[in-house]
Amino acid sequence: MRMKLGILAGCVAMGVALSAPAQNVVITNARIIDGTGKVIEHGSVVAKDGRIVAVTAGGPTGSASGTHIDAHGMTVLAGYIDAHRHIFKGEANAWLHDQAARNMKSFVDAGFTTVFSMGDDPHGILELRRQLSSGAMVGPTLYAARIIPLSAPTPPPASAAPRGPYTDLARTDPARPPDRPETAPPAIPDEQTRAAVRAARQDGFDAIKTFMLTTPGGPEGHTLSVIVDEAHKQGLRVYTHATAVPDALAAVNAHIDVLAHTAHIGRLEENATAVKTLLDSHVPMVSTLAVFIPHFDADNKPLFRDGGPFPMPRPLSSGGQGPVNARILWDGGMNYAYGTDTQWDPHDSFTDELRALNLVFSPRDILKILGPNTAAAIGKSSELGTLEPGKRADLVIVDGNPLDDVFNLTRVALVVKDGKVVSDKRGKRRAPT
């Protein structure tokens, strides 16, 4: 018994959350932006057993009980969702031991109660998900995609220049002309591809991730169709990286479920046929716009997402074209969702993505993108994205009105996940950035 108590005390001292049942919470005196288009200027939210049971104007009705939170006029929204994130840095076991708890807490501190990993160390990400779901650490609900290739690997050409210290492929995206490949890579046997999908399902992954870069006469489109067919048989959705318009078209023609990026290479304002094909597919698209705008450090140095100097000017052109393409598709009715595709601190990534979205979207648009659109894109509309009875009690309270200034979304004061307070920064919040 003494040993058990010692372990328990150690966990508490380190700020580690032990598994606990969902709780009840009552939030009063709040501005409520419920995600359906309705705003309640003075209202209450009641959650029981980790589920929302009431969202009302005025005070709570009936016998509401639980942790009481007076919002003092602050704004309550549904918990944020990042539908495209990469989490691990460096060797997986060392990261899990040394950084995971702090990193996961930083997500909920920034308001993110749900995160989708779009490609991390396979064993590490499943272990991280297990620890989060068991309550061994405080953090978001985590979903994980398994990457499956569309062609066999090929060695780099002998003439290829040696890579520098910063090796992020987005610096010189091979999807960008004139660097697109001109030779088709070897195909992968269909049954090998199907077996990889089945293995991902057996291992417990939530989705499949693919990278589409079409080549002349190449196998990519066929293999993606095979993956989609097998994934849907296994109950898995398929997310596809396609950064150029031709690759996005090939992906939707294979009937994928989600485009994991805004297609930022190619001018949709000059290609009405491509716009129509993308819209007619009804495939959601995830933003990830801030990859191609500089992230500024404390010394005002423009950095790329790998921490190195921002590689102007070629990626910067996508910083302009991506938002243009996004707005064109939005105006046509595309379900446009939120994701970052970075490894910066979640608060900083959020600020960067808002800067990019703010170029072409209104605060009202961005709230829809961040909430119900992203919930729909990851197939969780029945659980997340809006404040409605029956949905998961994942809530964010922010200081200020995001409809007046969208960057108020970053002024997170308190976060509730499954009816439990998991972050409380009232009185010690960052100034808006």
Region spans (language model):
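Active-site gating loops and adjacent loop-to-helix segments of metal-dependent hydrolytic enzymes
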Residues: 105-110, 134, 138, 152-182, ...
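Histidine/acidic-residue-rich catalytic or RNA/ligand-binding cores of hydrolases
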Residues: 91-94, 125, 248-256, 291-307, ...
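His/Asp/Glu-enriched, well-ordered alpha-helical/loop segment
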Residues: 318-402
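Histidine-rich, glycine-flanked metal-binding segment
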Residues: 32, 36-77
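Metal-associated gating/positioning segment near the N- to mid-region
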Residues: 74-136, 152-167, 246-260
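Active-site core of metal-dependent hydrolases
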Residues: 210-319, 344, 376-378, 396-399, ...
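Divalent metal-dependent hydrolysis catalytic cores, especially in the metallo-beta-lactamase
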Residues: 103-123, 139-147, 203-216, 237, ...
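C-terminal cap of metal-dependent C-N hydrolases
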Residues: 30, 366-372, 376, 392-432
